[in-house]
A protein has these predicted regions:
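Non-transmembrane, amphipathic alpha-helical segments
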Residues: 17-29, 46-61, 83, 101-115
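Long, acidic, intrinsically disordered low-complexity segments
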Residues: 2-19, 54-79
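Charged, amphipathic alpha-helical oligomerization/scaffolding segments
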Residues: 32, 36, 57, 61-68, ...
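Secondary-structure edge/capping motif, primarily at the C-terminal ends of alpha-helices
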Residues: 40-51, 73-80, 98-105, 127-134
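Short, charged, intrinsically disordered terminal tails
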Residues: 2-31, 121-141
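Amphipathic protein-protein interaction modules
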Residues: 63-112
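Amphipathic alpha-helical binding modules
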Residues: 92-141
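Hydrophobic transmembrane helix segments
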Residues: 28-41, 45
Length: 141
């Protein structure tokens, strides 16, 4: 697995990294992913309103990010086993779970999107940091 900045980055706030995925190179738009993670981790204020449409939009975006990052991380760590691959397997199963409907259960949906954002943050580090087969992944997986 190689990750490297790509010449495709055109603006200072548009860092991109090419990573080896299971089906070939994948370009990861780091700042865009980080912005979606930040949106998923936005605090829910007690008594404040939760916009179900916004939660649904952020959830859908983070699910796409998680699927892409997970595929790259699985390809990168497939031969290493251990804690990392156990966490990746667990996250793969969790992505298949049905999430709460934000219109019916907005607080539960907001908590789920925050959990998904934390998982994306961990995956982003796994695919952009140097490979460490002894890495212990502490997350909510």
């Amino acid at each position: 697995m190689t990750t490297s900045p790509t010449s495709a980055a055109k603006t200072p706030g548009d860092r991109r990294v090419r990573a080896d995925g299971p089906d070939g190179p994948v370009t990861l738009h780091i700042e865009a992913i980080e912005q979606r993670i930040a949106a998923g981790l936005r605090p829910v204020v007690d008594g404040g309103s939760i916009d179900p449409a916004e939660i649904a939009r952020v959830t859908a975006s983070l699910v796409r990010d998680a699927e892409t990052l997970l595929s790259v991380a699985e390809a990168r760590y497939k031969d290493h086993g251990g804690q990392v691959t156990t966490g990746l397997d667990s996250l793969r199963r969790r992505l298949a779970y049905r999430r709460p409907d934000p219109r019916l259960h907005p607080l539960n949906a907001a908590l789920c999107v925050a959990d998904l954002a934390r998982s994306c943050r961990t995956l982003l580090k796994l695919v952009t940091d140097p490979v460490d087969p002894h890495r212990v992944v502490l997350t909510t997986w």
